[in-house]
Amino acid sequence: MANTMRIGTHGRSLARASIPSVARIHALMRIEGLVPVVDSSLAAQMAMAGVPVEPGTEVVDNPALAGIDLFFSLGGDGTILDTVAKTGQSGIPVLGINLGRLGFLSSTREEGALAAIQAVKEGRYTIQERSLIALQGTDLANGETLIGL
């Protein structure tokens, strides 16, 4: 029997109205036999919005280190960049699900989440390699690192 795919999910500073969408995407993953693995910061956002993480969804501090097969970045293009920063050099593929208005990097809309989940489950996807640049400097606030694709 094949191993169950573990799909990491990450979102940053999501609008309260988007939180139920995250729960629906997790439910679709579970229905399709995948294991959603949610970043603890996203789980905290869900709890603050009164949307609990359902049984069958794992909560971890760093999904990139939790045996993840693929990441779903839930939000917009900024969230994809944040997700890529979290995955680092792991090589874990990232798929953006756009929960906002406009997305160039996260072009899959919430309405397409089920089709995306089924495609991932069935291996019907291709990985596009992207270059990643990082900017570090002494003038950046709090010593942060800026990244871009």
Task: Give the residues covered by each predicted segment.
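Short glycine-rich anion-binding loops that position phosphate/pyrophosphate groups of nucleotides
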Residues: 14, 77-79, 102
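Short glycine/serine/threonine-rich phosphate/pyrophosphate-binding segments
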Residues: 18-19, 78-84
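Short internal beta-strands
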Residues: 33-42
